Regions:
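Short cationic amphipathic helices and targeting signals
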Residues: 33-41, 128-135
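Conserved mixed alpha/beta catalytic, RNA-binding, or beta-rich assembly cores of soluble enzyme
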Residues: 1-21, 50-176
Length: 176
């Protein structure tokens, strides 16, 4: 959750959410996994890649035993190359390897090496939405929010990165 836990779209940074979890039989390396989405408003791929690299390097690479695999829900001809923005965290000691039927960058770190697929796919989608509900009690707010989250999470590909959130996203702000 670390890499998706910082609300930041309102200040022009990448935002993320967990779409769901995968069984061992559903991942390339046979371990439990999570499907995570990252979003940035607009169509500036270079800025998105730069911002995404922060999330990966600061919140995923530093966790022991992590691998990042591409997991697009639909085929895409657009992708981000990971070597320049993440792979070189190996300070020249990184290398590429073919494992699990994928081309991976192996980044040597303390416990053990971090691996990330050479290319991660880009897809377009709709980002940001608000569900407003009016309640008379705090308990009703939480119960209504839980029901809304359950409904959102039952939709394939949908994420609710902030669970029940007291703030609403907007495309621009006067006070970041």
């Amino acid at each position: 959750y670390d890499s998706t836990s910082t609300p930041s779209a309102v200040i022009g940074r990448v935002e993320g959410g967990v779409e769901g979890f995968l069984a061992k039989s559903e991942t390339p390396d046979g371990r439990y996994g999570a499907v995570v989405q990252y979003w940035l408003g607009g169509d500036n791929v270079e800025k998105f890649a730069f911002e995404l690299s922060y999330r990966i390097r600061q919140d995923i690479l530093v966790k022991p035993f992590m691998r990042v695999f591409d997991y697009p829900d639909e085929k895409s001809d657009e992708y981000i190359e990971m070597m320049d923005i993440v792979g070189h965290c190996g300070d020249g000691y990184e290398w590429t390897v073919e494992e699990y039927g994928r081309k991976l960058i192996n980044v040597p770190i303390a416990v053990p090496d971090f691996q990330i697929e050479e290319k991660l796919s880009l897809n377009k989608g709709t980002m940001g939405g608000n569900f407003w509900y009016l309640c008379e009690t705090q308990e009703a707010v939480l119960e209504g929010g839980k029901r809304a989250l359950d409904a959102i999470q039952s939709v394939t590909g949908a994420i609710a990165p902030f669970d029940i959130c007291s703030a609403a996203s907007k495309p621009e702000t006067n006070y970041p």
